[in-house]
Swiss-Prot record:
Recorded superkingdom: Bacteria
Subunit structure and binding partners: Monomer. Binds 30S ribosomal subunits, but not 50S ribosomal subunits or 70S ribosomes.
Name of protein: Ribosome-binding factor A
GO terms, biological process: maturation of SSU-rRNA
């Protein structure tokens, strides 16, 4: 049985691909660095779209707020081009949000690796050396 795949999901997926290409190719703002679009959630009435992004090299800088500000200012430009490429009667308003799930995932992976390493240290320290 085929999995239900709604129109808003299809539009969101296509918007994700098209926005990634448009940002890479057309947006010339120096505040926009290496941006990855992780997801696009489109409302049921196609009036609004939440665009979730990550920014490479954001450690210790204000790159994320600057990138969000630049993308928000370029939103009308991006909507215009999306309308041409996707041939939609009404292009959703774009709302950009930072996707913290990637950084949270990296943090959790580091915690797990540290716990496993500590566990191995305790196991190695508790076992007598049987090799001769």
């Amino acid at each position: 049985m085929a999995k239900e795949y709604s129109r808003t999901q299809r539009i969101g997926d296509q918007m994700q691909r098209e926005l990634a290409e448009l940002i890479r190719r057309e947006v010339k703002d120096p505040r926009v660095g290496l941006v990855t679009i992780t997801a696009v959630d489109v409302s049921r009435d196609l009036g609004h779209a939440k665009v979730f992004i990550t920014v490479m090299g954001q450690d210790g800088t204000d790159a994320v707020p600057q990138t969000l500000k630049a993308l928000t200012s370029a939103a009308s430009f991006l909507r215009l081009h999306l309308g041409r490429v996707m041939q939609l009667r009404s292009v959703p308003q774009l709302h950009f949000h930072f996707d913290e799930s990637v950084s949270r995932g990296v943090h959790l992976s580091a915690l797990i690796e540290r716990a496993v390493a500590e566990d191995r240290l305790h196991q190695d320290a508790g076992e007598p050396d049987t090799k001769e």
